[in-house]
Amino acid sequence: ACSFSDETYHYYDIKKAPFKIEGLAWFSKEKEYFRLPKDCQQDVSEAVYWLASHPAGGQLHFQSNSKTIVIKVQLAASANMTHMTGVGQAGFDLYYKKRNEKNYHFFTSTNYPYGQVEYSIVLYRNDKKEWKDFLIHFPLYMGVKNVWLGLEKDALLKPARKRKKQGKVVVYGTSITQGGCATRPGMAYTNILSRQLDIEFIN
């Protein structure tokens, strides 16, 4: 069921089924956009805990036939990096593929006013209603409080199809592994490999 509506769209909380969040190892248990357990603060440094609040590698998967998809976001803070794009630090980007296709296609990213901590923007638009697999990448260097997706009121929504490869690939590394300084989230190398190999990566 949708969380709320306006004149055009039903908005859905992506933490709830049928949406599937991948890339965040503790999400299924804690329902937080966080890369470590929330109660690990006493076991790691302040810097590590802060970086864990950035959901780099987080991916949202689902199927829909909506002609338009709107994303509504509440961030932990505004984008502020001088060496990285605002969309790479604090934005989302969307990929799609048709049911008979193997590879994802990039559509667009959230090019919003980067001083804002809340925004709503059209992330996908199509002239005709057709079923597609959708993949949305999370920000690389910014905490995320809440995300809702707006779909057309007559659109249908289904769980993501199973990946060809089961299991997970865990990657540990430097700021480059987290995604610095990719221009947008989908260009972080772990996200590229996840799409190409069709397997979940834990960043």
Predicted ranges, named:
Residues 1-168:
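N-terminal secretory targeting modules
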Residues 166-190:
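Catalytic nucleophile-elbow at a beta strand-turn-alpha helix junction centered on a G-D-S/GDSL motif
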